[in-house]
From Swiss-Prot:
Belongs to the complex I 20 kDa subunit family. This is NADH-quinone oxidoreductase subunit B. Transmembrane segments: none annotated. The keyword 4Fe-4S applies. Gene3D superfamilies: 3.40.50.12280. GO terms for cellular component: plasma membrane; respiratory chain complex I. [4Fe-4S] cluster binds at residues 63-64, 128, 158. Its main location: membrane.
Amino acid sequence: MGVIQAIDRLMTNPIPDGQVDDILRPQGESPLLQKGYVTTSVDALLNWARTGSMWPMTFGLACCAVEMMHAGAARLDLDRYGIVFRPSPRQSDVMIVAGTLVNKMAPALRKVYDQMPDPKWVISMGSCANGGGYYHYSYSVVRGCDRIVPVDVYVPGCPPTAEALVYGILQLQKKIWRTQTNAG
């Protein structure tokens, strides 16, 4: 099975035929379910909605940004999974930092992160964003964007493939699904 087929298998409904998807239903039998009502908790509903419509803001700084654009192109087409790249931090909930972060760009990264509405998540893409990469010992390079903003998922590679970014997004969706909100 190729990488594209594995990603499609993960993003489509992994439940075997004949079983019901229980994202919004509790375990076991309930008289409410027999009458056609769906019961769930507010946390489960919010996390389900957040994982299905992630809107990343691109923060491309170097060659990793080319692979990030490749992930949004026709071959992988993140749009069909509900992942739509947004141009403004006020419209996005995920930031993808791709490339070498230099000291002059660090305040801009923090300012853009602060403009994003809560809840917000960060994906660090590539060796340079993760820890400085090839330019680690340069005086002008920040040794990892996690020194500036909190990072939720690290995608390794120099540059990482578009499939690796999609896998990182899937891992972020799993992380969002496991989180508890303070709603309700």
